[in-house]
């Protein structure tokens, strides 16, 4: 049986949980220390609907300093995980402001899975208190669903890398989305 290879790129604001999500899925361990990513690649094998898929996981940096570097990871992407953090309404706001335009520019027609990370913090008293000081509250599931509709995402899912809840679901859904897409013929650039 031949292995199908697909490329997944994860994007979203800095510190919204992208790297933790990838590490928990690919290595089954939660990193306790936050280290901002520049670019990392992981590979994970996943089986969906009887198909063996080798998923190349491309981590990206969310910080603005990397806005010019990040597009280097976009070519030949099969599926995008676009993340925000449930404990950061600002990160959800950046989905239509920053991430959707960037992704749709560099990856037109690539399916987007909108992912609400850090779901476990939605009911965390400290998180609720800290957000209340700024007249904010954790992102509600219906706000995430509405955003997914607004940006025309393939799916909306929530997960917690810390508790592992929903993690596998995110990658199974992403793999299904990647498998559904018929690859267009690669266009060659000609310089005359």
Curated annotation (Swiss-Prot):
Record's keyword annotation contains Membrane: yes
Record InterPro entries: P-loop_NTPase, Small_GTP-bd, Small_GTPase, Small_GTPase_Rho
Membrane disposition: Lipid-anchor
Summary of the tissues where the protein is detected: Expressed in hemocytes (at protein level).
Positions annotated as propeptide: 190-192
Cysteine methyl ester PTM sites in chain numbering: 189
Family annotation (SMART domains): RAB, RAS, RHO
Positions contributing to GTP binding: 12-19, 59-63, 117-120
Location of the motif Effector region: 34-42
Keywords attached to this entry: Actin-binding, Cell membrane, Cytoplasm, Cytoskeleton, Developmental protein, GTP-binding, Lipoprotein, Membrane, Methylation, Nucleotide-binding, Prenylation, Sensory transduction, Vision
PROSITE patterns: RHO
Homology family: Belongs to the small GTPase superfamily. Rho family.
Subunit-structure text: Interacts with capu. Interacts (via REM repeats) with Pkn (via N-terminus). Interacts (via N-terminus) with wash (via N-terminus). May interact with dia/diaphanous (via CBD/FH3 domain).
Protein name, UniProt field: Ras-like GTP-binding protein Rho1
Organism: Drosophila melanogaster (Fruit fly)
Gene that encodes it: Rho1
């Amino acid at each position: 049986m031949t292995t199908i290879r697909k490329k997944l790129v994860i994007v979203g604001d800095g510190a919204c949980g992208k790297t933790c999500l990838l590490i928990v899925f690919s290595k089954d361990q939660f990193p306790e220390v936050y280290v901002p990513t520049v670019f990392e690649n992981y590979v994970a094998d996943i089986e969906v609907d009887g198909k063996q898929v080798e998923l190349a996981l491309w981590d990206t940096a969310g910080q603005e300093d990397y806005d010019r570097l990040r597009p280097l990871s976009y070519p030949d992407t099969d599926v995008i995980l676009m993340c925000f953090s449930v404990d950061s309404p600002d990160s959800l706001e950046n989905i239509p402001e920053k991430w959707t335009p960037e992704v749709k520019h560099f990856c037109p027609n690539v399916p987007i899975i909108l992912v609400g990370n850090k779901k476990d913090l939605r009911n965390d008293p400290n998180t609720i208190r800290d957000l209340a000081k700024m007249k904010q509250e954790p992102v509600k599931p219906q706000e995430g669903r509405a955003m997914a509709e607004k940006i025309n995402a393939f799916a909306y899912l929530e997960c917690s890398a810390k508790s592992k809840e929903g993690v596998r679901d995110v990658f199974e859904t992403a793999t299904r989305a990647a498998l559904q897409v018929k690859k267009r013929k690669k266009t060659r650039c000609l310089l005359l």
